[in-house]
């Protein structure tokens, strides 16, 4: 468990130091965390969780279709390069999530707006999968 937490901190460190992560919509996006040790429906899954305040149901300016383009971008340009730096098996699936506020993984948070997309990794690219 300690090794997983250390790896998550190492992977998250550059994003936190850089602050905002560029996405096509231009909305402000920051990394909340990366979760490696929870299995998904496709087997080993890496979850990259981001904070994107502009998706908020009340007062947000980014709709789901725009956010979906941002999630595709985050998978291909942010998550994939970090998968290549891990030790051990490569995840079969990447889940990208956006939330308008920080949320605890696995805890129902009705006040949060959250979007999720799942991707298979094929030929070095993220391929959207129905979730």
Regions found by a protein language model. Name each.
Residues 40-55:
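Short, compositionally biased low-complexity segments
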Residues 88-131:
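Polar/charged, Gly/Pro-rich intrinsically disordered segments
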Residues 51-93:
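Mature extracytoplasmic domains of secretory-pathway proteins
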Residues 13-17:
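Sec/Tat signal peptide C-region and signal peptidase I cleavage site
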Residues 18, 26, 41-45, 70, ...:
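Extracytoplasmic
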Residues 18-36:
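Short N-terminal segments immediately surrounding and downstream of signal-peptide cleavage
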Residues 3-12:
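Sec-dependent N-terminal signal peptides
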């Amino acid at each position: 468990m300690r090794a997983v937490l250390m790896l998550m901190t190492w992977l998250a460190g550059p994003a936190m130091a850089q602050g905002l992560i560029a996405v096509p919509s231009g909305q402000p996006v920051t990394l909340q965390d990366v979760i490696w040790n929870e299995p998904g429906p496709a087997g080993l899954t890496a979850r990259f969780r981001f904070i994107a305040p502009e998706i908020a149901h009340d007062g947000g300016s980014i709709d789901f279709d725009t956010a979906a383009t941002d999630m595709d971008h985050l998978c291909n340009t942010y998550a994939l390069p970090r998968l290549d730096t891990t030790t051990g098996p490569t995840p079969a699936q990447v889940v990208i999530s956006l939330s308008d506020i920080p949320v605890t993984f696995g805890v129902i948070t009705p006040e949060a707006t959250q979007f999720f997309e799942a991707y298979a990794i094929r030929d070095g690219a993220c391929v959207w999968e129905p979730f």
